[in-house]
Amino acid sequence: MKNIDLTNWKLLAEIYEYLFFFSFFFLCLLVIIVVKFNNSTVGREYTFSTFSGMLVYILLLPVKMGMLTKMWDVSTDYCIILMFLSDFSFIFSSWALTLLALERINNFSFSEIKVNETKILKQMSFPIIWVTSIFQAVQISMKYKKSQMNLEDDYCLLAIERSAEEAWILLMYTVVIPTFIVFFYVLNKRFLFLERDLNSIVTHLSLFLFFGALCFFPASVLNEFNCNRLFYGLHELLIVCLELKIFYVPTMTYIISCENYRLAAKAFFCKCFKPCFLMPSLRKLQQPTKSTQF
């Protein structure tokens, strides 16, 4: 809490503005690619649940920006609601992404096992992730409220500051626990996979764990240090690092939801930019030869 007076809130609000525009455009791009160019229907409901949760989180960024610039002066209760919605939307997206990964893993298994487990998963999944996400978001929001009970002024600024201090909780809830659930699920079914499928799953798990740790771990470890004495602007950078989830969660959702994410992206860009940019080899093929000119 010693770093609060040193935080450049206007700079942080400006960074939030850029994050909002880039992340909103990026999310819309991924949704278009998934809807138009992804032939796989496995786990589509989980895919769009993850995208919906991240969309809510992104749309809350301008609200945070308005509070950081003192454009809106809201009460303590409204600030708690804002922090709850922000945490809930992200936690819900993380659990929906976990269920998407589990269903995609079932798709690699034998048909009988796949059908039975997919039905059970769909029947139980959404009530479980709703209850789990609400419980975890309320728990974190109560920590915000308890730590700021005697600090009524600039409450939302302090709540956003507290979000960096509670980063290790979000790291456990949204990265470590889901990753280990999927890992043990794969470990239990490893004999059902081809080697290339198993390698692909392990690679995706490693990427998700790496980007999640990159997002939350620095803020949780360096929280007790006076970061601005170490490096000016490091404190704001750590808070901004927490927002990297608006990029890596949709990206992992897109990669996991597609049968071939490279093919889907290639089809999208070819359709959009083919009239303007053609490969030299394609141009040569389209040019008439000497024998056909006459």
From Swiss-Prot:
A GO CC annotation given for this chain: host cell plasma membrane
GO MF: G protein-coupled receptor activity
Stated name of the protein: G-protein coupled receptor homolog U51
Domain of life: Viruses
Similarity comment text for this entry: Belongs to the G-protein coupled receptor 1 family.
Keyword terms: G-protein coupled receptor, Host cell membrane, Host membrane, Membrane, Receptor, Transducer, Transmembrane, Transmembrane helix
Cell wall biogenesis/degradation recorded as keyword: no
Stretches that traverse the bilayer: 15-35, 48-68, 80-102, 120-140, 167-187, 201-221, 237-257
Membrane topology, Extracellular segments: 1-14, 69-79, 141-166, 222-236
Membrane-related topology note: Multi-pass membrane protein
Keyword Zinc: no
Segments on the Cytoplasmic side according to the record's topology features: 36-47, 103-119, 188-200, 258-294
Subcellular location as annotated: Host cell membrane
Major place of residence: host cell
